[in-house]
A protein has these predicted regions:
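A conserved structural motif in NAD(P)-dependent oxidoreductases
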Residues: 94-105
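Active-site loop-to-helix junction immediately N-terminal to the catalytic Tyr of the SDR YXXXK motif
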Residues: 32-40, 52
Length: 136
């Protein structure tokens, strides 16, 4: 979380009012996932950083939030060592019965950049079709 902190701290100095900073985290920030220790801890720190920066930058007219998407089937997943675990997560059904896509994440980012979202401050938006609501 150090790089996003340094970048955000410095770029905020020149950002105009009504600007946005959106961090991308993951469910591994609050749930323990196999082979995800370093990333999970970093994502948890990034969510905390999001809240602290949101309070610090809100008076300057800069909104800071984070987005926490579930797994998305992309080429990046082939670099994870636990392919069977990844496959089972991707095959799980969420209440929407739909796989998450990059477009789903982009739409939330666009929403957070719009003026109508100006009172959403310091929040972590979970995008998973309700998957985290269902006990497994």
């Amino acid at each position: 979380a150090k790089a996003p902190w340094i970048l955000s701290k410095n770029i905020a100095k020149i950002m105009p009012k009504n600007s946005r900073i959106i961090n991308i985290t993951s469910p591994g920030s609050s749930k323990v996932l196999k082979n995800y220790f370093s990333v999970g801890v970093s994502k948890a720190a990034l969510e905390s950083l999001t809240r602290y920066m949101a309070v610090d930058l809100a008076p300057k007219g800069i909104n800071v939030n984070s987005i926490s998407p579930s797994l998305v089937e992309t080429d990046a997943l082939k670099y994870f060592p636990n392919q069977e675990d990844i496959k089972s997560i991707l095959e799980r059904k969420n209440p929407k019965e739909k796989k998450l896509t990059p477009d789903d994440i982009a739409e939330v980012a666009v929403l957070l950049c719009q003026e109508k979202s100006n009172m959403i401050v310091g929040q972590n938006i979970i995008i998973d079709g309700g998957e985290n609501l269902v006990l497994r």
